[in-house]
């Protein structure tokens, strides 16, 4: 059975190699790749702009920005044991982009993270949405035609995107796993700064919480009541759980 599955995978890869060509290697710099270096409260981040770029994701561990059949180092990620590994381990080298391509005219901002962004509230609020704040340091959001998000199935995802005014421009990576755009934009991870997921989650940048508060908590009455929202983060076997009170 295993041999049969492997043969099937090899056939699928050859088919997509024929359609889109094999992934050759990786690239850091090019005339079509711009990298902006910014700081938010002494934290360093990169913003990546790639012209005529494909984005492929398996929706869980790997996302590849692909320019001329090369993976762009920086915005691409390949999570192994919760840590972003070498770009050489990206799944597209082994399996290619095993989904048919969808073309979007215009600029796309990728808000993709690991599989946690698909359904986990914490990862949505702290991994996905803060990338908007990072990008705003250099790019006017009005110039972005589409926002590629992990998922759109849950109410909290729809609600937060509506409050940010970008819901109608949002597309789900669950539906569109392989896309092409005139320009693809990505960022560094908002809070994964080291090779220790446990350390990073215990030292979340304060600006993320302040940004979330400024965007989503509005006091309707200054006299009568205050709405309090508490996030309790627990580390259990390197898994982040969220409780609301």
Language-model region placement:
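The feature primarily captures lumenal catalytic ectodomains
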Residues: 1-245
